[in-house]
Amino acid sequence: MEALVYTFLLIGTLVVIFFAIFFRDPPRIVKK
């Protein structure tokens, strides 16, 4: 059960970092 919690926290941290970088530096691939 603890492993599931740690995995959830790890994925959540990675997602937060990903979105922080994504919104800070707009992707050059998608041009609107």
UniProtKB/Swiss-Prot annotation:
SUPFAM superfamilies: Photosystem II reaction center protein T, PsbT. The keyword Thylakoid applies. It is found in: Plastid, Chloroplast thylakoid membrane. GO terms for cellular component: chloroplast thylakoid membrane; photosystem II reaction center. Pfam families: PsbT (PF01405). Its main location: plastid. Signal peptide: none annotated. It comes from the Eukaryota. It is a single-pass membrane protein. GO terms for biological process: photosynthesis. The chain crosses the membrane at residues 3-23. Keywords: Chloroplast, Membrane, Photosynthesis, Photosystem II, Plastid, Thylakoid, Transmembrane, Transmembrane helix. Found at the monomer-monomer interface of the photosystem II (PS II) dimer, plays a role in assembly and dimerization of PSII. PSII is a light-driven water plastoquinone oxidoreductase, using light energy to abstract electrons from H(2)O, generating a proton gradient subsequently used for ATP formation. PSII is composed of 1 copy each of membrane proteins PsbA, PsbB, PsbC, PsbD, PsbE, PsbF, PsbH, PsbI, PsbJ, PsbK, PsbL, PsbM, PsbT, PsbX, PsbY, PsbZ, Psb30/Ycf12, at least 3 peripheral proteins of the oxygen-evolving complex and a large number of cofactors. It forms dimeric complexes. Belongs to the PsbT family. HAMAP family: PSII_PsbT (MF_00808). This is Photosystem II reaction center protein T. It comes from Emiliania huxleyi (Coccolithophore).
